[in-house]
Amino acid sequence: MLRMNDELMLVEPSEEYFAELAAYRDDFLENSDSMDGCGPLRRFDDMKAYLEDTMRYTREETLPEGMVLATQFLCIRKSDNRLVGMIQVRHYLNDFLRTLGGHIGYSVRPSERRKGYASWMLKNVQPYCKSLGLSEILVCCLDTNEGSRRTILKNGGRFDGTAYHACLLYTSPSPRDCS
C-alpha cells in the first residue's frame, strides 16, 4: 500500500530525469522484465535520444506512420526524486491498441512494486484522459498479471473480455476526477 509520506507527482520526461530514466531502464533489464507504458525506453541507452523519440509521439506532424499520439509521464517520489513508475496515455486507439495495448500502459520499477504506485498512477492520470475527451479508457493486462488486474478493477475497470495472447480487456466508463 502507498505510504502516506510518499508524495508522488506525474511529470513529463525531461533532461532533469535522465539519470533516473537510465536507472529505471537498468532495473527492468536486470530483472528481465516487461517495460509496459515506457514507450521505446528499452531500445535506448542514450536518454537524450529517448526523450527526442518520445517527443515525436506528441505532435501529429512528427508522429511516425501507423502510430497514435501519446503522452508519457514519469511517476516521481518527491522525497528522494526517485522514478518509481511510468505511465503512457494514448490519445486514441488504432486496431492494434483496441485489442492489445489500450489507452494506458504503465509499469512500476521492480524494486518498488506492491506499494500502491500503479494504482496511484492510474487514478491520477484519469483527469488528463478526461481533458483529451476520452469517454472510456481501455486498459489491458495479461491474464497472468494479477497485480495489474486488481489495480485496474480498483480504479473502476470493468472486465470486457479476452483478446490475443490472453490479454484481458477492461474499460472504465468515464475518467474519474481525482479531487
Predicted regions: what is each one?
Residues Y106, R114-P127, R150, K154:
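Conserved acetyl-CoA-binding loop-helix of GNAT-fold acetyltransferases
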Residues T144-F159:
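Conserved active-site alpha-helix within GNAT-family acetyltransferase domains
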Residues I76, R90, H103-R114:
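A short, internal acetyl-CoA/4′-phosphopantetheine-binding micro-motif in the GNAT/acyltransferase core
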Residues Y170-S179:
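Single conserved hydrophobic/aromatic residue that forms the stacking wall/gate
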Residues S131-C140:
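Conserved GNAT acetyl-CoA-binding A-motif
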Residues M1-D53:
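A short, well-structured alpha-helix characteristic of acyl/acetyltransferase catalytic modules
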Residues C140-C141, R158-L169:
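Conserved catalytic-core motifs of GNAT/GCN5-like acyltransferases
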Residues R42-T99:
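Acetyl-CoA-dependent GNAT
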